[in-house]
Amino acid sequence: MMLILSILSIIAFAAASPVPSIDENIRVLEHRAVTVTTQDLSNFRFYLQHADAAYCNFNTAVGKPVHCGAGNCPDVEKDSAIVVGSVVGTKTGIGAYVATDNARKEIVVSVRGSINVRNWITNFNFGQKTCDLVAGCGVHTGFLEAWEEVAANIKAAVSAAKTANPTFKFVVTGHSLGGAVATVAAAYLRKDGFPFDLYTYGSPRVGNDFFANFVTQQTGAEYRVTHGDDPVPRLPPIVFGYRHTSPEYWLDGGPLDKDYTVSEIKVCDGIANVMCNGGTIGLDILAHITYFQSMATCAPIAIPWKRDMSDEELDKKLTQYSEMDQEFVKQMT
């Protein structure tokens, strides 16, 4: 009860404060001038394979090909993508690889998602840390510290790859919490002069409105893909001062094995939109670990789920957060 009262206090405070970024950024673009193309959909599927491959290639030796023993990255393997850098953070546990793909002429950074995502959801640890990207910037403490631990290694690998392949484009990707750290990585790598395109799948919100607007406006495209009622992109809550990058590409539910067409992908714009995934409720872990295919199937261990809170209790808590966010946004428009 005390937690709910605290959240209501946050909502009351926010409602009395000017929040221009919400008024300016809540709109749904189901019929955008630039719609989802077949190439976009193809890219969603391809970079998802890189995001999935990070679960079992985060410590692959330099010079070795990206390989997924579970058959979950066949197109990446077909292109013979070669690892040019890999790193595991000893403090935060974050893992990532940098690979070059001569067939597509690109340098790819792929960040591993956490195998303890339910643990993260249950802890409700949503503190922010000041970042130096832009004035007023705040980023989730855990995501920023994870990036800071591996930043030097990734930047060195990217710089070397660029020197060897000066015409290659740049892509950074990640699933789940890996998508969050990939978003932070994109922001800093872009600021350092590498125009990365960003593909994330089931990423949580990463920072405040200053951060979200900064990343959205940087050189380099954002493709933030969400699926059905995946609970992770709804966290941390809007009422806690978090915002998403824009736009969002929503795989609007259906069977887990659904073969989506471009017309079935809904595009929602705005850093605080609740028109796509943000308008859903509940705890649907299967929606989170299924993006075109089952995720983390090549991980060395199965995804464990913390049980300090029952699924029923967690479902109720997530539903409360979502409903509060929707009401908050409604009051701001």
UniProtKB/Swiss-Prot annotation:
Name of the top EC class for this enzyme: hydrolase
GO term, biological process aspect, one: lipid catabolic process
Keywords for this protein: Disulfide bond, Hydrolase, Lipid degradation, Lipid metabolism, Metal-binding, Secreted, Signal, Virulence
Species whose genome carries this gene: Fusarium solani (Filamentous fungus)
Comment on activity versus temperature: Optimum temperature is 37 degrees Celsius.
Major location category of this protein: secreted
Protein origin, superkingdom: Eukaryota
PANTHER family with a match to the protein in the record: ALPHA/BETA-HYDROLASES SUPERFAMILY PROTEIN, FUNGAL LIPASE-LIKE DOMAIN-CONTAINING PROTEIN
EC number: 3.1.1.-
Lineage of the organism: Eukaryota, Fungi, Dikarya, Ascomycota, Pezizomycotina
Catalytic reaction annotation: a monoacylglycerol + H2O = glycerol + a fatty acid + H(+); a diacylglycerol + H2O = a monoacylglycerol + a fatty acid + H(+)
Family statement drawn from the similarity comment of this UniProt entry: Belongs to the AB hydrolase superfamily. Lipase family. Class 3 subfamily.
Protein name: Secreted mono- and diacylglycerol lipase 1
Induction entry: Shows a low basal expression, but is highly inducible by lipase substrates such as olive oil, and repressed by glucose. During plant infection, transcripts are detected 4, 8, and 10 days after infection.
pH-activity relationship: Optimum pH is 8.0.
Molecular function per GO: hydrolase activity; metal ion binding
Compartments, as annotated in UniProt: Secreted
Function recorded in the entry: Secreted mono- and diacylglycerol lipase that allows the use of hydrolyzed lipids as carbon source and might play a role in pathogenicity. Shows lipolytic activity towards olive oil and p-nitrophenylpalmitate.
Signal peptide from the UniProt entry: 1-16
InterPro entries, A to Z: AB_hydrolase_fold, Fungal_lipase-type, Sec_MonoDiacylglyc_Lipase
GO CC annotation, single: extracellular region
Active site (record annotation): S176, D230, H288
